[in-house]
Amino acid sequence: CIVAFTMIGPFAWMVSASFKLNTEIFEYPIRWIPKVFHMDNYDKVWHSIAFPTYFMNTLKLAVIITVLQLFTCSLAAYAFTKLKFSGRDLIFLAYLATMMVPWHAIMIPQFLVVRTLGLYNTHASLILMQAFSAFGVFILRQNMLSIPDSLHEAAKIDGCSTFGIYAKIILPLTRSGLAILTVLTFNNVWNDYMGPMIYLDSDNLKT
């Protein structure tokens, strides 16, 4: 209970403060339930900025990037797990090593590439940069390793194509991994602050 309150406490205070006047927010002792519920703060947020536009842009990016990551990461994880090709494990390790590179180290080169390609101030810049994830491939690969190779071989003997095995057998058996990646990716894109600040300039595109 103590841990749960510690986690929920700040969120509850934030909701409570949203209904208070500025002078009431930091009063001591904390009044969790406001004396009077003021809706002015919500009215100001809704009308002082283009909140509906920002909200829809954020939702659009979060949904598109999440769907793309699920597709690209699951395909890559399937290849790294069930397909046999030269240098498979080495390529996976090299791809995984990209997680060790801080985003701040590639921020400027990334921006220069985006500008050179003419993608600056477009949602496509954010979508393309986040459509692939080494972390997502790692999660799904670990999940797919638990699927017996005999199941994959049996499907091949029955005449199922490689993509058919991926779509009809592998994906249904990795629902738990896909669910985890969905939540993590959506949450990460929804909370992304730096990306839109760097690559978007028009108010109608901001999140």
Positions of predicted regions on the chain:
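A hydrophobic, multi-pass inner-membrane permease signature
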Residues: 1-207
